[in-house]
């Protein structure tokens, strides 16, 4: 596995669509992704990454498998794009889930 930037760094460099480039490094913009799929998906827009997340058949008729990461599969089925608001929302969800886990395990008061 590698760390995938769902909203790619290259897109930010070219379009400057995030109000703050530091948001690229938030947990909400990252996911684990199989190395081969991450290489294929690289710097594409989210809408173009969907085929790599879900799997596809190339021009030679070879089937290229998709990811086994359930969250990316759900996102690729339900979202058309992944933008700044998605990064922020997902970041808050991840942090809140982690804090809740720590509390459930009595690791945080």
Question: Where does each model-flagged region fall?
Answer:
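Flexible coil/loop and intrinsically disordered segments
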Residues: 1-109
């Amino acid at each position: 596995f590698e760390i995938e930037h769902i909203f790619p760094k290259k897109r930010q460099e070219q379009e400057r669509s995030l109000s703050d480039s530091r948001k690229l490094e938030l947990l909400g913009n990252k996911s684990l992704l199989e190395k081969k799929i991450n290489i294929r998906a690289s710097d594409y827009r989210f809408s173009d990454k969907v085929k790599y997340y879900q799997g596809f058949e190339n021009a030679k008729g070879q089937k290229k498998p998709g990811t086994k990461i359930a969250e990316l599969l759900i996102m690729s089925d339900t979202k058309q794009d992944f933008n700044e608001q998605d990064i922020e929302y997902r970041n808050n969800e991840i942090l809140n889930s982690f804090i809740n886990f720590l509390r459930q395990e009595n690791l945080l008061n």
